[in-house]
Amino acid sequence: RKYNLSPKKLSACVEHYNKMELSFVVHLGDFIDRDFASFDKVVPIYNQLKAPHYHVLGNHDFEVADDKKALVPAKLGLKHRYYDFARKGWRFIAIDGNDVSLYAWPKNDPRTKAAAEYHKSLKPRPPSWNGALGDEQLKWIEDKLQAATKAKERVMLFCHFPVYPKNSHNLWNAGALTELLSRYPCVAAYVNGHN
């Protein structure tokens, strides 16, 4: 891993993208690795994009001190950890696969304890660095899919964690999400990072 090369690579990427006519750009997570101060190096570069640009939260984005975890979304310019936006007959849904996780909340946070109990219940037990969507977020996604269906919009989802094919890097509750998505013909694509 050569993370010290990231600012230079990101600058080259932004320069390349700025030569294109893009509708938008989505970064699929892991914007940093283990150092909250790294956001100050890469966020200003990313913000030089001419096209509208968005973030999805990755597991490495939360590998920071407990007192910094709550600051991560705002540092990336996010008002909400999951959100949606529309463009030309499409509904784009950015979801938070770190909603239920062992690392995205402080160690003494009740959400971390609940995530530990959930993780312990999974068989076979997936890696601790993955995460899941909470019930509230799953309901929110379904509401968005229903609204997209009614508006005759196609839907593309963005998440850090994959859901398919079945493997150890997937969202802990990939099955619940794929079952939900399969009920809505408006869903055209699911795009992930992580791997």
Protein language model features and the residues they cover:
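N-terminal active-site segment of His-dependent metallophosphoesterases
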Residues: 1-40, 136
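Short, well-ordered secondary-structure micro-motifs
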Residues: 22, 66-67, 105, 167-170
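Active-site neighborhood of phospho(di)ester-bond hydrolases with catalytic His/Asp-centered motifs
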Residues: 25-30, 53-59, 95, 156-159, ...
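Second-shell loop/turn segments in exported
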Residues: 29-32, 126-131, 165-166
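Extended active-site neighborhood of metal-dependent phosphoesterases/phosphodiesterases
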Residues: 37-151, 176-186
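Short acidic, glycine-rich surface-loop motifs adjacent to enzyme active sites
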Residues: 145-165
